[in-house]
Amino acid sequence: MQIIVRDNNVDQALRALKKKLQREGVYREMKLRRHYEKPSEKRARERAAAVRRSRKLERKRAERDGIR
């Protein structure tokens, strides 16, 4: 990953770096890897995330179609 510092503006370069790291999911990965996660816990977490995604998709579809 490369960030260009223009006109010695380090603050702007740091903001750009943080934004890139956020988009790449580095912070989320660091948070998950702080402690060991058992495979069963990982499966449960991923399953719960899939359920949340599917519910959100259903809500969006219902809202788009005008169904409550």
Curated annotation (Swiss-Prot):
Key word Ribosomal protein present: yes
GO biological process, one term: translation
Basic and acidic residues composition bias: residue spans: 37-49
InterPro entries: Ribosomal_bS21, Ribosomal_bS21_CS, Ribosomal_bS21_sf
GO cellular component terms listed in the entry, alphabetical order: ribonucleoprotein complex; ribosome
An MF annotation (GO) of this entry: structural constituent of ribosome
Key words, A-Z: Ribonucleoprotein, Ribosomal protein
Basic residues bias locations: 50-59
UniProt KW Ribonucleoprotein keyword: yes
Residues covered by region (Disordered): 36-68
PANTHER family referenced in this protein's UniProt entry, alphabetically: MITOCHONDRIAL 28S RIBOSOMAL PROTEIN S21, SMALL RIBOSOMAL SUBUNIT PROTEIN BS21M
Family: Belongs to the bacterial ribosomal protein bS21 family.
Name of the protein: Small ribosomal subunit protein bS21
Native species: Zymomonas mobilis subsp. mobilis (strain ATCC 31821 / ZM4 / CP4)
Gene that produces this protein: rpsU
